[in-house]
Amino acid sequence: MPKTRHEPMPLEHVLREHVFLLGHDQRTPEHRHARGHLVYPATGVLSLVTPLGSWIAPSNRIVWIPAGFEHQHRAHGRTDMRIVFMAPSLAARLPEHPAVLVMTPLAREATLTLTGSERRSAGVRSRLRRVIIDDITTAPEQPLHLPEPHDDRLRAVVALVEEGMSSPLTLGRLGHQVGASERTLSRLFQQETGMSFPQWRTQLRVHRALLLLAGEVSVINTATACGWANPSAFIDAFTTLVGQTPGQYQRSLREDARTAGAAGTGGAAGTGGAAGHGGADRSGQVP
């Protein structure tokens, strides 16, 4: 995959908001930006892939990406991606690593307004960015990070788990297939991901569930597809990580889609995948 690296840009270009429409499964090249920025999927679901692993954000979450952090986006479903670059003084209030944060109703409206088609003065835009930061920093960081292991045996296990998610195997049986003992794999998972294998697999299942539910798959069918023995176990695990039940999550996505639709797409949107976030902003500048 080609890599696009963005050199530092003048402040007036860096602090411009962007809107991009990505088709299902469309991906941007790996790239980085000179300023930290927030990425909000007003519709659809967005994955953030980095050397540290992946994060996933539906339309009731917002992603923070620090300055200089190499990353790639992947859209799940037709995704309306809004990008808001932050001045260093505001970026300092956010984590030094990528993070998924709760998108509050106030922050959502400020983001949609800031990235909307109506031109705003520099003062208004500055105040809107401050509103977003003030609001999203009141909630804790969301545990939606899936660490990426680097050991070849763990990578082989990950591939097997992803391929057979609806029929999960024990770590011992997975180890037999990749030529490693259960004890070795268990130790490696803890060392490389900071999680036990069951914790990591639950995180992976919830990531997959977020995508299926966003695609209007039923709760029962999602539970089965992701390998849970019964819907109750799925609902408990999902609620623990996401902070709402699968049904509440689906309802909130529908409401967010209506809100984003009423606000419009905010002007010209990049749809290609050749550079950076996949296109130019309203002024023709590549972000």
Predicted feature residues:
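Short acidic-glycine-tyrosine-enriched beta hairpin
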Residues: 52-67
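DNA-binding recognition helix and immediately preceding turn/loop
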Residues: 148-199, 215-226
